[in-house]
C-alpha cells in the first residue's frame, strides 16, 4: 500500500472508531448478554411510561371534547345580531363581528390603493428611490 493512501485510511479508521458508540448493540443473530437484557428492560419501562402518558392525553382530549360539545348549544343560541354593541372597543381594533374578508375589502378599497404601484407599498417606496417599478417616471 502506498504511504500517501495509508495515512487518510488510518485517519478515517480512527475517526470511525471515535464516533462509534461504546455501548453499541450486538448483531441481532448473536447471543443475548445480561447487558442487552437490561437495556431491553429499560426500553420496555420507557415504552410503558410513554403509553401511560398517551392514555392520559387521550383522556384529557376526550374530556375537552365533551366540554366543547356541552358548550356548543350555548354558542349557537347567541347570534351576532343579538349580541350587544360594545361602545368601549377602540377604533383600530377589529371588533368580533368584523370578519377577515371585511378587513381585506377595506384594505383593497380605491382610497387605500390610490398611489400604490404593482409591487406593493414597501417595494414601491424602494422603486421610487431606485427607479425600479411600474409607475416610475424616469428623468433622463
UniProtKB/Swiss-Prot annotation:
Recorded superkingdom: Eukaryota
First-listed, main subcellular location of the protein, grouped into a coarse class: secreted
Tissue expression per record: Brain and also in atria, but at much lower levels than ANP.
Location of the protein in the cell: Secreted
Chain positions covered by the region annotation Disordered: 71-94
PTM note: The precursor molecule is proteolytically cleaved by the endoproteases FURIN or CORIN at Arg-108 to produce the brain natriuretic peptide 32. CORIN also cleaves the precursor molecule at additional residues including Arg-105, Arg-108 and possibly Lys-111.
GO biological process: blood vessel diameter maintenance; cGMP biosynthetic process; cGMP-mediated signaling; negative regulation of systemic arterial blood pressure; neuropeptide signaling pathway; receptor guanylyl cyclase signaling pathway
SMART domains: NAT_PEP
Keyword list, A-Z: Cleavage on pair of basic residues, Disulfide bond, Hormone, Secreted, Signal, Vasoactive
Site feature Cleavage, where: 105-106, 108-112
GO cellular component, one term: cytoplasm
GO MF: hormone activity; hormone receptor binding
Record carries keyword Signal: yes
Protein name: Natriuretic peptides B
Lineage, opening ranks: Eukaryota, Metazoa, Chordata, Craniata, Vertebrata
Gene this chain is encoded by: NPPB
Amino acid at each position: 500500500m502506498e504511504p500517501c493512501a495509508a495515512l487518510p485510511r488510518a485517519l478515517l479508521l480512527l475517526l470511525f472508531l471515535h464516533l462509534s458508540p461504546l455501548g453499541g448493540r450486538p448483531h441481532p443473530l448473536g447471543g443475548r448478554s445480561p447487558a442487552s437484557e437490561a437495556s431491553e428492560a429499560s426500553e420496555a419501562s420507557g415504552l410503558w411510561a410513554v403509553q401511560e402518558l398517551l392514555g392520559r392525553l387521550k383522556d384529557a382530549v376526550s374530556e375537552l371534547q365533551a366540554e366543547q360539545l356541552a358548550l356548543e348549544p350555548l354558542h349557537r343560541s347567541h347570534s351576532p345580531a343579538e349580541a350587544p354593541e360594545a361602545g368601549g372597543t377602540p377604533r383600530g381594533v377589529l371588533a368580533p363581528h368584523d370578519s377577515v374578508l371585511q378587513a381585506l375589502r377595506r384594505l383593497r378599497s380605491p382610497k387605500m390603493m390610490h398611489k400604490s404601484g404593482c409591487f406593493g407599498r414597501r417595494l414601491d417606496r424602494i422603486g421610487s428611490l431606485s427607479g425600479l417599478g411600474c409607475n416610475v417616471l424616469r428623468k433622463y
